[in-house]
Amino acid sequence: MDAQHWDERYRSQDRLFSGNPNGVLVTEAVGLTPGRALDVGCGEGGDALWLAGRGWQVTAVDISQVALERGAAAATAAGADVAGRVIWTQADLSTTPPPGAFDLVSMQYFPLPAEPDHTALRGLLDAVAPGGTLLIGSHDLADHATYRDRHPDFDPAAYYQPADVARLLDDGWAVQVNETRPRTTAPPEGTHHVHDTVLRARRLR
């Protein structure tokens, strides 16, 4: 799925997502001290704007220019204080983020393809500064049964799940949350996602 695919998908609707921040982010990041955040697969910017509104300096990254333009427009509407805290960046994960640059790396419901050498994933892990937080939220695979019935080519094993990432973390990390739990927000329209899988880990060094 390339930039053209996602641009077309965003153009197919006036708004693809709700514009609200994801529940996992709100629950897990509300108590963190604001700093520098990387929002991976930011879409139309709901999470980025929530973070910026709480004092974070946010780098919001997505492959879709259409999504980024919508996010930037929403930031402008939210006011200069919020808009000035977000940098909207078009990139895919072949572009490695700068190491140690972020106090929070957040990846919410982003389909990150699993790789034998974990190159893209390790780039994201390296982007977390010592003392910073990695936060990943995903749909529970048990809720995907109906989707798999309609899309038999879909292979969930082709993508990292939060628990997969937890197993790859070394002793330079402290895992604080690694669990499956009920969603705190309504699932996307037309889906049956009722549980989230969540990983929150703190980089020690």
Please place each PLM-identified region on the residue numbering:
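Conserved class I S-adenosyl-L-methionine
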Residues: M1-L32, G35-G43, A142
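Class I SAM-dependent methyltransferase SAM/SAH-binding core
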Residues: E44-S94
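A short acidic, Gly/Pro-enriched loop at the edge of an enzyme's catalytic core
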Residues: T96-L104
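A short SAM/SAH-binding and catalytic strip from SAM-dependent methyltransferases
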Residues: D103-D117
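A short glycine-rich, Lys/Arg-flanked "PGG" loop and its adjoining helix->strand segment in the class I
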Residues: H118-P130
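Conserved beta-strand signature within the Rossmann-like core of class I S-adenosyl-L-methionine
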Residues: G131-H139
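Short alpha-helix
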Residues: P156-G172, V177-N178
